Amino acid sequence: MDRTLIQEILEVVEQAAIASAHLTGLGKKDEADAAAVEAMRKRMGKIEMQGRIVIGEGERDEAPMLYIGEEVGSGSGPGVDFAVDPCEGTNLCANNQRGSMAVLAASDRGGLFNAPDFYMKKLAAPPSAKGKVDIRKSATENINILSQCLGLAVSELTIVVMDRARHKGLISEIRATGARVQPISDGDVQAAIACGFAGTGTHCLMGIGAAPEGVISAAAMRALGGHFQGQLVYDPAIAQTSEWADYTKEGNIARLNEMGITDVDKIYEAEELASGNNVVFAGSGITDGLLFHGVKFEPDCTRTSSLVISTLDNTARFTNTVHIKDGAKSIALS
């Protein structure tokens, strides 16, 4: 991958964000997702690359495009693997709430873990805590370590947790330490990445979310030098989700084994989930969030706010783009 390709990857998430933003607040989460998928796929098709979707909208028979294994791009050029979530936080987008974004991770071939559509226990923390906090430790232990690493009192720490029934005990434990809990309804990718930047007011992400999004978070945190660990969750009693109402622990283990995952309890580091030589994260806000603004529509232009993080040159670039409409008469500076 080179800088030209990275610029095109940025445009992929910008176009997906704009497409979804036209449906923000209309209560149409499926339509918003479909619009983002179509826009992302269309822009990817214009890139000189041999692209491949390793994490996408589902298996080939489950999704019309951006399905797992789909080839994208011109068919010539560098081989690139993608993990995509064209509209992360579809409910947030549908209800015009904070935190929805178009997001992807990219790497050279074989550089992204092909995560199954399972749940994942996650731990994200700032670079100063990398290798010191550990997903095997209790929330209390990790909070005390985090306090020491950041030079903050425990009461000054904010821990982000998905607002789910399965996290009732975790939230109680965090609050018992004196740390603050910030529950989120959806969209833990942006929350995880925010832990990698000072000044966001977010210091740690704990709890269980979707495994595919864990790979995207890991790619960003690896490029930032932040801490990220993930462990697949296969026990329905732990996941506590209606989606697994008919599943069993033994059945899920068998499913993982069929996918080639025999060590079902393995703890994955960021460098294992995103192991490529060149790893890129790109995200563009659909609605306002922790890291960037959402799409803004104006008479003569559309504005997007995005972030690209790359191991190629060890940079994190925040980009505000003005997409000028045909026949525009005047463009405000901001």
UniProtKB/Swiss-Prot annotation:
- As given in the record, the signal peptide range reads none
**InterPro entries xrefs:** FBPase_class-2/SBPase
Q: Which GO terms describe its biological process?
A: fructose 1,6-bisphosphate metabolic process; gluconeogenesis; glycerol metabolic process; reductive pentose-phosphate cycle
Q: Which GO terms describe its cellular component?
A: cytosol
Its cofactor is: Mn(2+)
Q: Which cysteines are joined by disulfide bonds?
A: none
Question: Which positions does UniProt annotate for Mn(2+) 1 binding?
Answer: D33, E57
Q: What is its EC number?
A: 3.1.3.11, 3.1.3.37
Under Pfam families, the record lists:
FBPase_glpX (PF03320)
Q: Where does Mn(2+) 2 bind?
A: D85, E88, E213
User: Has the keyword Aminoacyl-tRNA synthetase been applied to this entry?
Assistant: no
Identify the residues that bind substrate.
Answer: E88, G89, T90, Y119, R164, A165, R166, D186, G187, D188
Q: What class of enzyme is it?
A: hydrolase
- Could you state a single Gene Ontology molecular function term? metal ion binding
Which pathway features in its UniProt record? Carbohydrate biosynthesis; Calvin cycle
Q: Which UniProt keywords apply?
A: Calvin cycle, Carbohydrate metabolism, Hydrolase, Manganese, Metal-binding
The catalysed reaction is: beta-D-fructose 1,6-bisphosphate + H2O = beta-D-fructose 6-phosphate + phosphate; D-sedoheptulose 1,7-bisphosphate + H2O = D-sedoheptulose 7-phosphate + phosphate
SUBUNIT field: Homotetramer.
Task: Give the protein's function.
Answer: Catalyzes the hydrolysis of fructose 1,6-bisphosphate (Fru 1,6-P2) and sedoheptulose 1,7-bisphosphate (Sed 1,7-P2) to fructose 6-phosphate and sedoheptulose 7-phosphate, respectively.
The Swiss-Prot or TrEMBL record describes its family as follows:
Belongs to the FBPase class 2 family.
Record's protein name: D-fructose 1,6-bisphosphatase class 2/sedoheptulose 1,7-bisphosphatase
Give the organism the record lists.
Prochlorococcus marinus (strain MIT 9303)
